[in-house]
């Protein structure tokens, strides 16, 4: 059964006098339990339509989730959605699982006449939002969207003039939220310093022997750690959009779309560690009036390999949208084709580790030369790119009916 603007406002506890005076009212309603929430979100759809909604929700789940054995977040949400927007019964176990959500605060908004000429953001990741309007005028440059929040949007008359903002192809969008990007992996550790060269020797008292030995090469820098995975997206949630009187204006149509939450990008791999410093050359020996040369320093160690980029997050499936318009106005609603939520791309590989510094030459013995410094190490290599997340989120359906 259709309700008037003022009847809906009264149910929300909004003052008729204030609304008649042109005041927009926004309030928070405390809902005590899930039955009260279902009652609050009744949109006037007849029993047969509500039954169709429940069947459509469950038709996407195979096998049908059993309340006793299937307690995943997705399964619970599906059964609760079928209860609130359809006529499916809710099992006692699901009631217990959702009990902690109550009492719940619901955002309610009423305005007798509202004109918008810019995007109207109804919120992100809130409990529930209810919008009650008499006449909504959407001028050029306007659009309406909500993210990861259940919505009940009821308006008597819509006047749609002009087009949405640039790069926006919808008038009303029910969206999810992209998962958070993974954080970068930790850098690899610095390679150890190379060992010192052997000391020079005297072959006999007063007679020089061997020069100092060369320092050994520094150790390779550590491999960077793998970037952290991107977060899974947050789903687009169920919405009812009801126009009780009609849609007019130029072009006088409403374009509706939905897309769930894409997976977040994987984190960048950690930078490879710096190569270790080359070991010092061994000192030359002093043998009476002569000595031996110091040994050359060791080469710096190679830089470490960058860490592999993190795995992208999963796109998550969206929930259904129910649009009701007056008889003869089905053509006033344009449904955009479903847009699936992509999986997040893998993170970039970590940068190469820096080349290790050269080791210093050993000092020379009496009247002998010190050893030369070693060479720098080579830089490491770039880490591998992370892999894309494993799941694409299927968009919810948009159902349009006369009522």
Predicted regions and their residues:
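Extracellular beta-helix/beta-solenoid repeat scaffolds
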Residues: 2-211, 227, 231-262, 320, ...
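Glycine-centered low-complexity coil/loop motifs and glycine-rich tracts
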Residues: 140, 144-149, 169-238, 250-322, ...
């Amino acid at each position: 059964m259709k309700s008037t603007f003022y009847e809906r406002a009264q149910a929300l506890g909004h003052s008729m006098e204030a609304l008649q005076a042109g005041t927009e009212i926004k309030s928070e309603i405390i809902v005590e339990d899930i039955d009260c929430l279902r009652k609050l979100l009744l949109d006037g759809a007849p029993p047969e339509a509500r039954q169709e909604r429940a069947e459509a929700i469950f038709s996407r789940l195979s096998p049908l989730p059993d309340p006793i054995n299937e307690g995943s977040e997705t399964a619970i949400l599906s059964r609760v959605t079928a209860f609130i927007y359809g006529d499916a019964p809710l099992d006692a176990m699901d009631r217990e699982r959702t009990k902690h959500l109550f009492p719940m605060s619901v955002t309610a908004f009423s305005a007798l006449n509202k004109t918008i000429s810019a995007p109207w953001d109804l919120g992100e990741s809130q409990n529930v939002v209810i919008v009650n309007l008499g006449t909504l005028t959407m001028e050029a440059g306007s659009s309406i969207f909500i993210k990861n929040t259940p919505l009940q949007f009821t308006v008597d008359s819509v006047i749609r003039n002009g087009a949405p903002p640039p790069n926006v192809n919808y008038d009303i969008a029910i969206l999810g939220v992209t998962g958070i990007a993974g954080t970068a992996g930790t850098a690899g550790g610095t390679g150890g310093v190379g060992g010192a060269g052997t000391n020079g020797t005297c072959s006999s008292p007063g007679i020089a022997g061997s020069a100092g030995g060369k320092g050994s090469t520094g150790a390779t820098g550590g491999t960077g750690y793998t970037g952290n995975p991107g977060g899974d997206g947050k789903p687009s949630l169920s919405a009812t959009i009801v126009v009780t009187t009609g849609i007019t204006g130029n072009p006088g149509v409403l374009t509706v779309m939905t897309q769930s939450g894409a997976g977040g990008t994987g984190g960048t791999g950690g930078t490879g560690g710096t190569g270790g410093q080359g070991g010092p050359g061994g000192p030359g020996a002093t043998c009476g009036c002569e000595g031996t040369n110091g040994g050359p320093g060791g080469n710096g160690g190679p830089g470490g390999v960058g860490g592999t980029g993190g795995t992208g997050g999963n796109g998550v499936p969206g929930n259904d949208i129910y649009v009701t318009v007056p008889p003869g106005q089905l053509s006033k609603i344009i449904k955009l084709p479903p847009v699936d939520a992509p999986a997040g791309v893998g993170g970039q590989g970590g940068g190469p580790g820096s080349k290790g510094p050269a080791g210093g030459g050993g000092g020379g013995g009496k009247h002998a030369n010190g050893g030369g410094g070693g060479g720098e190490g080579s830089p490491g290599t770039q880490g591998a790119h992370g892999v894309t997340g494993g799941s694409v989120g299927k968009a919810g359906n948009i159902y349009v009916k006369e009522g």
